[in-house]
């Protein structure tokens, strides 16, 4: 099923309401990382350049619903947008009754949608109020597409026209390219502390990919399932059978050497050893150089790569070499590569490979749910509206 795209519509003179994900970190009234604002900027500029009356809405943090709070106000985001665009972007607090002005080619930013009662529960009355403000609703926030809320789902049901913004459309296209008809061989990297939190992702990818690289605590569980000693490493002993059943479906190249320490700390001494030599008081905190080199070769010959999660505790430099080696291999590969998940983005930043990854997903939870094959409510609503 397809969706209507904002780029296919004539926006001139239209009231265009765009839902973006501008949930950025703010400290002392200043935006400290503007990656999400930068990602949304092309959509906002495009609508303004086409002569639309542009309204942008987003959530910020987790305020108590229905209560205005200074710390969750969109004011710092408005100030940051103003500096990026070179003109004032007013932040409108009481907008639900439409008591504000926007010129053609102009822009206003609405105050935090979570200050509105009924936002989280996808309240119909609130959804209709949002919808009444616009001629065209643009859903451009992939990061919140997995939540059925009034500003992502309900408004799309009642707006005269509901479409996908360029950011959301690009995200769906990239994920579709990686998961629906991947060029082979396809290699997926799934790493994290627990198998239990990534179980659906592992199961889903085991059906699609040719090789599944596991890392972090997840790898320890797979190592233990293959009868290797993992010492006092993070490991889920109750999921060994689950790990074995996944390993029976897809090739999972396990590390042959690892980097261990006696404690989990920034100053812990790193020790490289073959997997067979892990002792009872060891913690496995990264894959070893031999394993990293072998996996890098695997990645270089791949045609599609999906990356979710660092393979070691890369925040501590002595346990970051595995993740660094794989990040560089993905960057050097000719494969179509897609990466997503908070820790993954931090690793991409740390090792400076963002320019070399084909697509970096902006959604954490939404990215994982899409990979799991789940329906994203906001996207499903756009598909439904397109089919009318």
Curated annotation (Swiss-Prot):
Q: Respond yes or no to whether keyword Disulfide bond is given for this record.
A: no
Give the EC number(s) under which this enzyme is classified: 2.7.2.3
Q: Which GO terms describe its cellular component?
A: cytosol
List, alphabetically, the SUPFAM superfamilies matched.
Phosphoglycerate kinase
Localization recorded for this chain is: Cytoplasm
Annotated residues that bind ATP are located at 198, 315, 341-344
Annotated residues for binding of substrate? 21-23, 36, 59-62, 114, 147
Q: Name one GO molecular function term.
A: phosphoglycerate kinase activity
- Report which reactions are catalysed by this protein: (2R)-3-phosphoglycerate + ATP = (2R)-3-phospho-glyceroyl phosphate + ADP
Pathway where it operates: Carbohydrate degradation; glycolysis; pyruvate from D-glyceraldehyde 3-phosphate: step 2/5
Task: Write down the InterPro entries for this protein, in alphabetical order.
Answer: Phosphoglycerate_kinase, Phosphoglycerate_kinase_CS, Phosphoglycerate_kinase_N, Phosphoglycerate_kinase_sf
What are the UniProt keywords, alphabetically?
A: ATP-binding, Cytoplasm, Glycolysis, Kinase, Nucleotide-binding, Transferase
An example GO BP is: gluconeogenesis
Q: Which family does it belong to?
A: Belongs to the phosphoglycerate kinase family.
Q: How does it assemble?
A: Monomer.
What is the name listed in the Swiss-Prot or TrEMBL entry for this protein? Answer: Phosphoglycerate kinase
What gene is it encoded by? pgk
């Amino acid at each position: 099923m397809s969706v209507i795209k904002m780029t296919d519509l004539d926006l001139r003179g239209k009231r265009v309401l765009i839902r973006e994900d501008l949930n950025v970190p703010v400290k002392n009234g200043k935006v400290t990382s503007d990656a999400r604002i930068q990602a949304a900027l092309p959509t906002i500029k495009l609508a303004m350049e086409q002569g639309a009356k542009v309204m942008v809405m987003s959530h910020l943090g987790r305020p108590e619903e229905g209560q205005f709070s200074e710390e969750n106000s969109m004011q710092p985001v408005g100030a940051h947008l103003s500096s990026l665009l070179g003109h004032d972007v007013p932040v409108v607090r009481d907008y639900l009754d439409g008591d504000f002005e926007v010129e053609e080619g102009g822009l206003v930013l609405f105050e935090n949608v979570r200050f509105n009662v009924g936002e989280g529960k996808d309240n119909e009355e609130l959804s209709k109020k949002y919808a009444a403000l616009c001629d065209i609703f643009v859903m451009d926030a992939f990061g919140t597409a997995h939540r059925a809320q009034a500003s992502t789902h309900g408004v799309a049901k009642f707006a005269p026209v509901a479409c996908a913004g360029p950011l959301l459309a690009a995200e769906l296209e990239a994920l579709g390219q990686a998961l629906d008809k991947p060029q082979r061989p396809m290699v997926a990297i799934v790493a994290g502390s627990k198998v239990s939190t990534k179980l659906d992702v592992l199961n889903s990818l085991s059906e699609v990919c040719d090789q599944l690289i596991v890392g972090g605590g997840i790898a320890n569980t797979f190592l233990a399932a293959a009868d290797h000693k993992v010492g006092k490493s993070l490991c889920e002993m109750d999921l060994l059978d689950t790990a074995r059943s996944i390993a029976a479906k897809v090739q999972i190249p396990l590390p042959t050497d690892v980097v261990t320490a006696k404690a989990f700390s920034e100053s812990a001494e790193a020790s490289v050893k073959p997997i067979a030599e892990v002792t009872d008081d060891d913690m496995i905190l990264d894959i070893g150089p031999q394993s990293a080199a072998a996996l890098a070769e695997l990645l270089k010959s791949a045609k599609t790569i999906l990356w979710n999660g660092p393979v070691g505790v890369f925040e501590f430099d002595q346990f970051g070499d595995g993740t660094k080696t794989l990040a560089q291999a993905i960057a050097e590969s000719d494969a179509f590569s897609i990466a997503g998940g908070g820790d993954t983005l931090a690793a991409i930043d740390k090792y400076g490979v963002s320019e070399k990854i084909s697509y970096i997903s902006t959604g954490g939870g939404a990215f994982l749910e899409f990979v799991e094959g789940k329906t994203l409510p906001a996207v499903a609503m756009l598909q439904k509206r397109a089919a009318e």
